[in-house]
């Protein structure tokens, strides 16, 4: 019965008597996730299951259909591949809810072993005891190969013994009879099942039938009613926020007859709906209290702030208007300065020379002088003392000495300085008397200085000392620390200069690296422990991916695991016979014959480690692939070359002998001379010829570069000529450039570290040798050689193709061959054809050139047909053009169209140019290839190696079919779920790298929080995508609130790098999970800087804490924003990002910004700058903006802005007011306001603006102290203060939501007013308000002043120009009159007719479009059959309005002139149309000949229309017509190009239909500001049906169609006719009868009896399309 055990390997065979419990009649499979399947993945089936998400809990569950016993499990992998499962657990369940693991003998969850290396190998496990269950869940843990993350299974569940006794099946009870099939003589059925019980364990099935019928309904004549299918859902009752929609059905399927019952149930269903959230405009919070003054005196500052959080703006609502913070001066009084005395001056001369005199001295209170209420100096300013007390003589003596004495002091001089502290001086003379007869000189100074004080001098500011450093911004890893200083030492005063230099410094901090947790390397297996008698395989792994560092956790789990039994065959008991030694292992059975040379060099400073790595890899390679089919030669080289072992094809060495030989040999020292190794390899292959069918390979191992290239090109050429493949392995820090010389395909150069696992590396080497790591490729070649060197070039082309065939074989790569010149010859056109490699080479050798001029268009069309019809379903498709000159029979436009058709089939197009015309070929190929790098120029083709060209082609062929993209990610994760969100961000980046590679997309990453850090950018070189993925996995979050401005600034620097590729698409993806605190203005500035550099910004919000406004600001299109939950699948999010990047693939580059349209903001509207781009390749998709606008010159014009400040007398109010009207002046710091009492009907507050003003905005605020405000109000306006007009028919404007914030409303007036009244309607508490008006003066804004002479000269010049223009216009008018008289009168061509114009032709006319500026939005135009209409005639349509009078509002005329000279795709630029004319001519009641009037019932108010005039026409409206001149914001928003983006595909048939075509560029037309706007326009609605849906935009278009002669037979009710259709998005059939006089359509019914509807599309020569559409309808 077999060997039973709880854990082990494959049994010798299938146990006897096993029953398969998985049958097609009872089986059900379901899985946790699937990339393939699950379908029915049973053993030996083509169905299989592969897990999509590998996270240790993936599972495949089989429902056996009943509870049973099983004791044997079997698994396989994906058929025909190596994708399988090496380990898995099994869980079982009785009820499908509670699952338990199958346990081993140790009581732990049993680990089952799957097949190794082969998806078709069956691996079974027998259990020691049967398990009872209905549900069996397989929980795979690891794939077959560690580097392959695919988990794929096919399963079997069997019962071999201990099976319960057989259970025979028994029928269940009969079900009730079902409904009768017909109203008369129908049948009814009932059924039963064989499930009570079901047959199991070999039991017999039920006997008898499982279905019975009986006759029912004997036709008594009654018919019960039946419901029709539900109709379409109506539109949502609201345009935003929750509403209701409904649908209906009727009791007509069938209708009740002859007393039959009516239908039961409702005829109407309704359900909630929501088109979108209503926009929520942001509102300011209350101002915070004033902060403390920064200075006690001398002028300080106080601050208060508010936030835009009451409410936060949402769903596209406007941000708050105004400033977030205010500052005020405080304590401006000067600081007190107390006075201080100057030093005493010198004593004066004594007043007498004898007899007792006095002398004095003074001081001044100026050191400093008292100021700002400072205390004056204490004490006196003069000191007097006696002097010369001696007695005077009684008589004079001539010899008595006369001492000198000073005269009085002179006047003080002026102060020595103009500001601050200075001095003044005065002097005296010694002449009162002068000294004589030996008398003494005057005592004391002759001059005196005193202080003086002028105005204060300016004080320049000076910095205080730096403050302390702040804490580091990150806990580990690089961070920033900051410190600050203030400009207060001293603070600048008296107009002094401010401090220079920054007030902030930063420094790097936290040099301690963040902990890095260890990660396991891939498993690597050891050789079997025994060659016979059953050994075991072990596998090991290392904790080095990455190694734990800086305190990080070590890896969890075991380093070594026992694997499965191996070499279980019995050991031989008799001596072996004499034969060549055993050389191989079973593992090499699926590989071809290989003659393989290993060249090993280890000469670096780390040569011991690198050489051991190389030697271990070679040993593992030999162990894995054996030596039967692979024969080996090994050389070791450095400065010299030594052979370790040579080929021996007769008796090849055994695995052990090979391993012993390489293990014994040491590395050779000295410089690495790679040229010598290449020459030795060539010698080895010459000495010992290779086996006939063996592939020749050289694998080079090196850990350093050669001192010089040593002419490697010449050394490797003989190897290439001998068809030897060279694979290079650089171990350690080896420059790849040298290795790329000998291995031209970058995929053939492997860069690894010495710690790389030998098992994984040996597999990578074999994958490159056999090219089995590439996908299925269908590659087509188109060859053309017509230059003077065509013979040599054509041979070169064939050599290149032959090299690709020889290197890549014919298993995974299939070929087609086209040769073209003026004609196209398809030599090989079926990718599904199975050819041998020799057959394919023979096809290439026999290719014959096609002469004459090149017609590349024909080759592209032939290729498109081949790939569409003959390509394999899952293959990568590549088309390569090989040419030596330009295609003279093709133009850029036709090439664009034909290559676009190829790209629709997902074909990557490459081109190779040979010879002297490579530059010209490259210019033409810009219309063919996706990016310039897809063109390969080979000007010096004789010198270029065939292998280099061939491998360059194949390397590019393996790239993804994408344009070049320079892609930067800015990641910020600071929410409460930051770990989960940052993990999703990193995994999304990794998914992009894994899916799309690093060749066509270059990457950069910025991580930001409160600061932005660039982790890597386009200048960072990554050897392969695995290294980049590893780099992304090591990213760490940045702390703090996300500063979007800092992130965008850093991104701007990234896109300024010289490494940004000129032809690459530049993309920034911002991923955040929290609200940003960035200033909106700063953010807009950075966004514009990126847009100026043509950077596409995509915003991705992760989680629930991001605000839509943050993402909306940074993107120029709301479709460029994504929202993702934390459980979003990473691959799906990556695909959504790529789809946004590729959406506008067919658009050209943006043009430069235009000049600003205005020099300043007028009427609240700033100027605009415009840039445009064209739809270069429509078939690739042009789903993006064509026109981009930005605001510019936002400063208000002179004379524009808030009116005021107004005098108190300018504010007046209605009589019943409780407060003065002047309190209505808007003042955010004033807590009072004007209030209206008793809610007076029509009460108001009036503002006299003092002059006529064009008002464009009003603002209101509530009363803060009473917490009262107005929530809605309306306006009236007047020019003279007597006659007031309601603004917009007294439409209510939104007021305030609190008492503190200011609410603004934009208004649109067409004339100036002086008086504005605010009428409160709804309010909170009491109707209290402050108000302000914004407007512009009516006077003309004058240019800068000029001199009188300049003005006079300018005026003369203008008059001359005007006279010339007047003469030209007069001449043109005379010519027009002559034309009219001759053509319309004399020739009889002037009669007007009903209908639109078309020219008489024998084929259908094209559709014509009306120009934007000349189109009008008529709802429906009557269509009148006429025999003939002239080209230049016009149609007039009058629409009658039923208001308070019987007169129509006007007549609208338009006309079209056509061009008969050529059949072409006509666009708006080719149509010459009259400008719409507005006429009051119809007021008289007379209708022009040929016009049609649409009349309406006077009592039918619901169907009446209003048509409002455009702004240009409304200037002449009377006062009462104010309402007609207003264009609402909602209409202005709808009439943009973006409105059509959502609807453009609705004009087309589904993609699967034969008439499907790409985006129809010529129907992109939007309304202009000069057109009529429509209000209350509900009579005609959108036509329902596949061509026009409810989401259709307002895209006016006109079609004209002329039926062919006899195309509508009279027998079918048809007749020759013309049709017109002028519509906004299509017209639905009116509900009223066709003869209702409201339409005036009697006698105008049109029958199209041939077909009900249809569409035809014809391509035109210039690349456009001509489309026709027809349908039948009333009138």
Swiss-Prot record:
Q: Does the keyword Membrane apply?
A: yes
Q: Where are the transmembrane segments?
A: 1357-1377
Name the domain of life.
Eukaryota
The chain's Cytoplasmic topological domains, given as residue ranges, are 1378-1675
One Gene Ontology CC term in the entry: membrane
* Protein biosynthesis keyword on record: no
Sorted alphabetically, the keyword list is:
Disulfide bond, Membrane, Repeat, Transmembrane, Transmembrane helix
Which SUPFAM superfamilies does the UniProt record give?
A: Galactose-binding domain-like (SSF49785), TSP-1 type 1 repeat (SSF82895), vWA-like (SSF53300)
Its name, as the record gives it, is: Coadhesin
Q: Which organism is it from?
A: Acropora millepora (Staghorn coral)
């Amino acid at each position: 019965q077999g060997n039973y055990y709880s854990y082990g390997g494959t049994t010798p065979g299938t146990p006897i008597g096993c029953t398969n419990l998985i049958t097609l009649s009872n089986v059900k499979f379901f899985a946790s996730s699937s990339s393939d399947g699950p379908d029915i993945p049973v053993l030996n089936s083509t169905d299989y299951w592969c897990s999509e998400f590998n996270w240790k809990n993936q599972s495949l569950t089989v429902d056996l259909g009943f509870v049973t016993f099983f004791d044997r499990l079997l698994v396989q992998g994906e058929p025909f591949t190596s994708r399988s499962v090496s380990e898995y657990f099994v869980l079982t369940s009785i009820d499908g809810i509670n699952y338990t693991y199958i346990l081993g003998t140790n009581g732990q969850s049993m680990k089952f072993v799957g097949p190794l290396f082969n998806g078709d190998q069956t691996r079974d496990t027998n259990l020691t005891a049967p398990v009872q269950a209905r549900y069996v869940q397989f929980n795979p843990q690891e794939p077959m190969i560690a580097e392959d993350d695919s988990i794929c299974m096919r399963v079997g569940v069997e019962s071999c013994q201990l099976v319960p006794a057989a259970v025979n099946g028994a029928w269940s009870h009969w079900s009730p009879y079902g409904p009768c099939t017909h109203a008369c003589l129908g049948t009814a059925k009932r059924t039963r099942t064989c499930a009570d019980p079901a047959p199991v364990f070999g039991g017999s099935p039920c006997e008898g039938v499982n279905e019975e019928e009986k006759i029912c309904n004997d036709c008594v004549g009654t018919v019960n009613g039946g419901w029709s299918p539900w109709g379409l859902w109506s539109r949502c009752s609201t345009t935003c926020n929750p509403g209701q929609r409904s649908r209906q059905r009727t009791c007509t399927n069938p209708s009740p007859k002859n007393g039959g019952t009516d239908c039961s149930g409702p005829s109407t269903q309704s359900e909630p709906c929501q088109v979108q959230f209503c926009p929520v405009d942001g509102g300011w919070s209350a101002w915070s209290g004033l902060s403390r003054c920064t200075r006690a005196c001398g002028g300080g500052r106080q601050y208060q702030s508010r936030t835009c959080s009451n409410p936060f703006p949402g769903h596209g609502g406007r941000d708050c208007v105004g400033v977030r913070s205010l500052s005020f001066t405080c304590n401006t009084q000067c600081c007190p300065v107390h006075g201080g005395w100057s030093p005493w001056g010198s004593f004066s001369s004594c007043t007498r020379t004898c007899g007792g005199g006095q002398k004095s001295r003074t001081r001044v209170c100026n050191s400093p002088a008292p100021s700002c209420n400072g205390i004056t100096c204490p004490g006196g300013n003069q000191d007097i003392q006696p002097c010369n007390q001696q007695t005077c003589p009684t008589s004079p003596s001539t010899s008595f000495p006369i001492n000198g004495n000073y005269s009085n002091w002179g006047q003080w001089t002026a102060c020595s300085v103009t500001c601050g502290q200075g001095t003044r001086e005065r002097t005296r003379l010694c002449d009162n008397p002068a000294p004589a007869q030996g008398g003494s000189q005057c005592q004391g100074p002759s001059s005196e200085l005193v202080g003086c004080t002028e105005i204060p001098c300016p004080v320049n500011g000076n910095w205080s000392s730096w403050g302390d450093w702040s804490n580091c911004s990150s806990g580990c890893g690089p961070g920033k620390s900051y410190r600050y200083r203030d400009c207060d030492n001293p603070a600048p005063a008296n107009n002094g200069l401010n401090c220079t230099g920054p007030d902030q410094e930063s420094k790097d901090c936290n040099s301690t690296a963040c902990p890095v947790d260890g990660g396991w390397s891939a498993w690597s297996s050891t050789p079997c422990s025994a060659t016979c008698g059953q050994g075991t395989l072990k596998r090991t792994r290392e904790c080095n991916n990455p190694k734990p560092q800086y305190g990080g956790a070590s890896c969890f789990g075991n380093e070594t695991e026992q694997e499965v039994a191996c070499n279980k065959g019995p050991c031989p008991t008799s001596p072996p016979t004499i034969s060549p030694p055993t050389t191989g292992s079973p593992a090499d059975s699926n590989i071809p014959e290989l003659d393989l040379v290993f060249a090993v060099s280890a000469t670096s400073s780390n040569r011991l480690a690198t050489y051991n790595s190389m030697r271990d890899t070679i040993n593992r390679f030999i162990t894995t692939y054996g030596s039967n089919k692979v024969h080996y030669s090994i050389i070791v080289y450095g400065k010299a070359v030594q052979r370790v072992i040579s080929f021996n094809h007769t008796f090849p060495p055994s695995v052990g002998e090979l391993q012993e030989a390489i293990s014994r040999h040491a590395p050779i020292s000295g410089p690495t001379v790679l040229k010598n190794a290449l020459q030795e390899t060539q010698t080895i292959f010459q000495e010992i010829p290779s086996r006939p069918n063996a592939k020749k390979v050289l694998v080079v191992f090196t850990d350093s570069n050669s001192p010089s290239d040593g002419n490697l090109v010449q050394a490797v050429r003989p190897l290439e000529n001998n068809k030897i493949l060279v694979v290079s392995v650089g171990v350690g820090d080896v420059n790849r450039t040298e290795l790329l010389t000998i291995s031209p395909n970058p995929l053939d150069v492997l860069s690894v570290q010495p710690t790389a696992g030998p098992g994984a590396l040996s597999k990578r080497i074999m994958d490159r040798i056999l090219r089995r790591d590439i996908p299925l490729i269908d590659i087509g070649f188109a060859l053309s050689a017509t230059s003077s060197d065509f013979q040599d070039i054509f041979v070169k082309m064939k050599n290149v193709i032959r090299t690709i065939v020889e290197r890549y074989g014919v298993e995974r790569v299939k070929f087609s061959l086209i040769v073209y010149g003026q004609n196209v010859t398809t030599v090989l056109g079926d990718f599904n054809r199975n050819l041998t490699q020799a057959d394919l080479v023979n096809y290439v050798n026999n290719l014959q050139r096609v002469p004459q001029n090149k017609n590349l268009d024909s080759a592209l069309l032939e290729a498109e047909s081949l790939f569409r019809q003959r390509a394999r379903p899952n293959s990568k498709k590549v088309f390569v053009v090989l040419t030596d000159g330009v295609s003279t029979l093709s133009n850029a436009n036709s090439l664009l169209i034909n290559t676009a058709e190829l790209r629709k089939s997902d074909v990557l197009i490459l081109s190779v140019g040979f010879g002297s015309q490579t530059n010209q070929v490259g210019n033409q190929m810009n219309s063919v290839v996706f990016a310039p790098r897809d063109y390969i120029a080979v000007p010096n083709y004789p010198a270029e190696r065939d292998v280099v060209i061939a491998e360059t082609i194949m390397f590019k062929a393996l790239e993804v079919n994408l344009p070049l993209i320079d892609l930067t990610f800015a990641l910020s994760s600071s929410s409460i779920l930051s770990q989960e969100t940052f993990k999703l961000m990193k995994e999304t980046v990794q998914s992009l790298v894994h899916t799309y590679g690093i060749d066509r997309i270059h990457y950069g990453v910025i991580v930001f929080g409160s600061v932005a850090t660039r982790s890597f950018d386009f200048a960072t070189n990554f050897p392969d995508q695995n290294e980049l993925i590893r780099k992304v996995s090591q990213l760490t979050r940045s702390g703090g609130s996300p500063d979007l401005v800092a992130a965008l600034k850093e991104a701007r620097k990234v896109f300024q790098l010289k490494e940004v590729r000129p032809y690459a698409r530049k993309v920034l993806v911002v991923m955040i999970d929290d609200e940003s605190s960035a200033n909106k203005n700063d953010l807009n500035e950075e966004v514009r800087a990126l847009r100026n550099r043509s950077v596409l910004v995509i915003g991705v919000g992760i989680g629930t804490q991001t605000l839509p406004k943050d993402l909306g600001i940074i993107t120029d299109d709301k479709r460029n924003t994504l929202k993702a939950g934390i459980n979003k699948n990473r691959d799906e999010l990556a695909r959504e990002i790529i789809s946004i990047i590729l959406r506008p693939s067919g658009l050209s580059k943006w043009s430069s910004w235009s000049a600003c349209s205005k020099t300043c903001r007028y009427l609240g509207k700033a100027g605009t700058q415009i840039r445009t781009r064209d739809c270069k390749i429509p078939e690739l998709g042009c789903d993006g903006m064509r026109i981009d606008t930005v605001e510019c010159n936002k400063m208000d014009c002179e004379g524009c802005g808030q009116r005021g400040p107004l005098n108190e007398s300018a504010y007046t109010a209605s009589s019943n007011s409780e407060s003065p009207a002047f309190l209505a002046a808007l003042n955010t710091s004033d807590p009072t306001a004007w209030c209206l009492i008793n809610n007076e009907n029509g009460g108001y507050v009036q503002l006299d603006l003092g002059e006529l003003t064009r008002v464009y905005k009003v603002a209101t605020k509530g009363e803060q102290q009473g917490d009262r405000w107005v929530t809605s109000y309306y306006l009236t306006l007047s020019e003279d203060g007597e006659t007031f007009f309601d603004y917009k028919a007294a439409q209510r404007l939104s007021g305030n939501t609190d008492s503190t914030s200011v609410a603004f409303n934009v208004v649109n007036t067409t004339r100036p007013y002086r008086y504005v009244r605010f009428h409160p309607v709804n309010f909170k508490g009491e109707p209290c308000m402050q108000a302000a008006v914004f407007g512009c003066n009516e006077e003309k804004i004058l240019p800068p002043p000029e001199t009188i002479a300049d003005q006079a000269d300018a005026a003369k010049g203008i008059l001359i120009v005007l006279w010339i223009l007047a003469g030209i216009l007069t001449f043109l008018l005379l010519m027009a009159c002559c034309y009219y008289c001759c053509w319309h009168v004399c020739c009889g061509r002037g009669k007007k007719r009903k209908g639109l114009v078309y020219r008489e032709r024998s084929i259908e006319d094209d559709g014509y479009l009306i120009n934007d500026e000349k189109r009008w939005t008529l709802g429906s135009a009557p269509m009148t059959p006429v025999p003939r209409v002239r080209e230049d005639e016009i149609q007039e349509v009058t629409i009658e309005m039923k208001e308070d009078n019987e007169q129509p509002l006007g007549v609208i005329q338009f006309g079209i002139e056509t061009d008969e000279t050529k059949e072409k795709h006509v666009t708006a630029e080719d149509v010459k149309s009259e400008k719409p004319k507005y006429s009051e001519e119809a007021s008289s009641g007379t209708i022009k000949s040929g016009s049609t009037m649409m009349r309406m019932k006077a009592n039918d108010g619901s169907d009446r229309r209003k048509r409002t005039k455009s702004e240009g026409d409304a200037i002449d409206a009377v006062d009462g017509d104010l309402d007609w001149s207003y264009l609402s914001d909602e209409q202005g928003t709808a009439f943009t190009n973006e409105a059509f983006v959502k609807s453009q595909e609705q004009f087309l048939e589904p993609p699967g239909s034969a008439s499907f075509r790409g985006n129809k560029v010529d129907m992109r037309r939007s309304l202009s500001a000069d057109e009529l706007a429509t209000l209350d326009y509900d009579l005609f609605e959108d036509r329902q049906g596949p061509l026009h849906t409810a989401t259709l935009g307002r895209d006016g278009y006109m079609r004209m169609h002329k039926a062919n002669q006899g195309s509508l037979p009279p027998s079918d009710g048809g007749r020759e006719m013309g049709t017109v259709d002028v519509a906004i998005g299509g017209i639905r059939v009116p509900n009223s009868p066709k003869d209702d006089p409201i339409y005036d359509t009697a006698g105008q019914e049109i029958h199209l009896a041939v077909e009900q509807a249809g569409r035809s599309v014809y391509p035109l020569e210039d690349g456009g399309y001509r489309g026709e559409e027809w349908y039948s309808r009333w009138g």
